[in-house]
Amino acid sequence: MTSRYPSFAAEILDLFAEREAVLTDIAIIQPADPFLDMAGEDLRRRIFLTESETGETLCLRPEFTIPVCLDHIEKRASTPRRYAYLGEVFRQHREGSPEFFQAGVEDLGAKDRPAADARSLADARAILSCVLPNTGFHVTLGDQAVFEAVLSALGLPRGWQKRLARAFGSPAMLEAAIAEFTSPQGTANLPREVASLVAQGNEQRLTHHIEEAMQAAGHSPTAGREPDEIARRLLEKAALRSVRLSDAALNALKSFLAIKVPLEQAGERLTAFADEAGIFLDEALADFSARAERIGDHALPLDEIRYDAGFGRPLDYYTGFIFEIGVEGLRQPLVGGGRYDRLLTLLGAEEPIPGVGFSMWLDRIATVRGEKP
């Protein structure tokens, strides 16, 4: 380890080895498309993009989960398998350094999902306890699968289910989506020509117009959402514009999102919510309860673990269990992680491979230790 690395980096690598996670080497330069397609809007805006001599869009590594999964697929490695990593990632920020260290574990192919979820949380918590002894932590859990089950059980149109699911993890986006669902705004705020093309439902012409407008304004189509994605979403919004969310469904959704309880009480509270709303969530709640039971098996301090029904993480690839670990006095989390069962298939795996993992922000840990990041 060179002096560039945090002072506790070697200790973390030893802790990874103890947990049977094999250290993997991931290139700093990565193909950009997987991140632009799957990493979420917030991360897309922060990616450092470049281009190869052959015209391929490349980027500096903005995170590790996607490239670790790509590497696993390329090597046709067997599963289950646990990968560890420690290195720099690169993201554009208005303040602070654009490069910082992350470390983490990706657990691929474990068939017992509740056990793998619990192990991921327990490993993250145990490693933090080693590098930050005598520190009190708070753990926030969410579940994308439970949220999506609620949307389905409430009978929302499929398009709106997808829209709200994409917004999960961003309170501002979710609030805006719900507001639009309850009182659609039409195309009044769109430029006249765009509004006309949306009204016609001509996706090809709309995509072409958006691409020309982006080029005229000097915006690269690969710097954020691509023109065809923008056109698709505009047309999707137009198709759903006449749909209204009933008062009963809206109240039930708001009631669900307001649930914030200790993990020990979460299963009972979710069951009560389903009964009150008159909806069937048995399968999603069975998975939730199985995971909570496995978390209890690791003897974690349950008084520091809370379930927040509206909590998600702003990355598009999460599908179920989501968590963050933080400390008092620091607004940003020290660790974030969750389950991403669809990601490897979307990246090209020949068969479904379940995955769960976590990332640690080593600069934030250094700050809590009283060291210079």
Swiss-Prot record:
Pfam family, one: tRNA-synt_His
SUPFAM superfamilies assigned: Class II aaRS and biotin synthetases
GO biological process terms on file: histidyl-tRNA aminoacylation; L-histidine biosynthetic process
First-listed, main subcellular location of the protein, grouped into a coarse class: cytoplasm
GO cellular component: cytoplasm
Pathway: Amino-acid biosynthesis; L-histidine biosynthesis; L-histidine from 5-phospho-alpha-D-ribose 1-diphosphate: step 1/9
Keyword presence, Amino-acid biosynthesis: yes
Top-level taxon of origin: Bacteria
Keywords of this entry: Amino-acid biosynthesis, Cytoplasm, Histidine biosynthesis
Gene Ontology MF: a single term: histidine-tRNA ligase activity
Cell compartments where the protein resides: Cytoplasm
Miscellaneous note of the record: This function is generally fulfilled by the C-terminal part of HisG, which is missing in some bacteria such as this one.
Subunit organization: Heteromultimer composed of HisG and HisZ subunits.
Function: Required for the first step of histidine biosynthesis. May allow the feedback regulation of ATP phosphoribosyltransferase activity by histidine.
Annotated family: Belongs to the class-II aminoacyl-tRNA synthetase family. HisZ subfamily.
Name of the protein this chain belongs to: ATP phosphoribosyltransferase regulatory subunit
Species in which this protein is naturally found: Chelativorans sp. (strain BNC1)
Gene: hisZ
